[in-house]
Regions:
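Glycine/proline-rich active-site loop of Rossmann-fold NAD(P)-dependent oxidoreductases
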Residues: 100, 113-116, 126-141, 150, ...
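Non-catalytic, hydrophobic alpha-helical segments
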Residues: 1, 171, 175, 190, ...
Length: 266
């Protein structure tokens, strides 16, 4: 069972908190109960989010560089934030809270009932057919704007906010390895790590390079509530448990596939 259903927008969640929580938290509980009652031996994989950490990553001692914010190479999270970061006492956004509720419930069903549940806390999950929008799925939406000429809006942090991006193939391959040898109630950060990450500014440059034209970009000073300034996932725990897994796609590979997909549709 691969549970990817969700309400994924921060802004939409703030407008309709009850609906958001019903979809993300209660919906997950419904699936867990159905699994426990009818096929308790099944592997249950849940796509969580890095927003379960709230805005705690924004307390990191970031350094402002020309195109991005960055950590010093000697910082313990330089190679990415791992699962030891606190999920408590921070601003998550209402979306983050509903996903965290589901995240913990999936873990608990694994530990309490002995079910084969696994939680994957995603950074930016993307791929060539990602239907990104202004509210979420930034890399896909960015390339869409690069191809169409539509205006792209940057919200805060001078466009230097950093995200890691994992290709859908690589993420599904993580799921496959977990399915073959599940660990009950386990949780993993799942993202592009140091292998595939970029700032908003760097992503714009890459999209312009691949699309072969300048983008229409507008900057707004105010960041989104609870938005991360810097997020890179440390996936060393997953690699330790599943050493045969590896990345297959770089950031440029993913962007080129997006561009090809969008120009074919056009």
């Amino acid at each position: 069972i691969i549970h990817t259903a969700a309400q994924p927008s921060h802004d939409w969640a703030a407008k309709e908190p009850k609906t958001d929580f019903t979809i993300n938290a209660n919906g997950t509980l419904t699936l867990l109960e159905a699994t426990r009652l009818h096929c308790p031996e099944a592997v249950f994989i849940f796509t969580s989010t890095n927003k379960v950490y709230g805005d705690t990553p924004n307390n990191l001692p970031l350094v402002e560089l020309n195109t991005r914010y960055e950590l010093h190479a000697d910082h313990k999270f330089y190679y990415g934030i791992d699962e030891t970061m606190s999920i408590d006492q921070s601003k998550h956004s209402l979306f983050g809270v509903s996903k965290l509720s589901a995240d913990l419930m999936v873990q608990e069903y694994g530990r309490y009932f002995g079910m084969n549940t696994g939680v994957f806390r995603g950074g930016c999950l993307t791929g060539p057919n990602h239907a990104g929008t202004q509210m979420h799925g930034f890399l896909s939406y960015l390339m869409k704007c690069a191809v169409s000429g539509q205006k792209y809006e940057i919200n805060g942090y001078k466009g230097k906010q950093v995200r890691d991006n994992i290709h859908s193939y690589d993420l599904v391959n993580m799921f496959h390895h977990f399915y073959q040898n599940p660990r009950q109630g386990e949780v993993y950060n799942a993202g592009g790590g140091r292998h595939s990450n970029c700032s908003m500014n760097e992503a714009i440059e890459l999209c312009q390079e691949i699309a072969g034209k300048s983008m229409n970009v507008e900057y707004f000073e105010t960041p989104r509530i609870g938005d991360h300034i810097w997020w890179i996932s440390n996936i060393s725990k997953f690699r330790e448990h599943y050493p045969e897994w590896c990345y297959h796609y770089t950031l440029k590979d993913t962007l080129r596939q997006m561009h090809k997909s969008l120009t074919i549709k056009k």
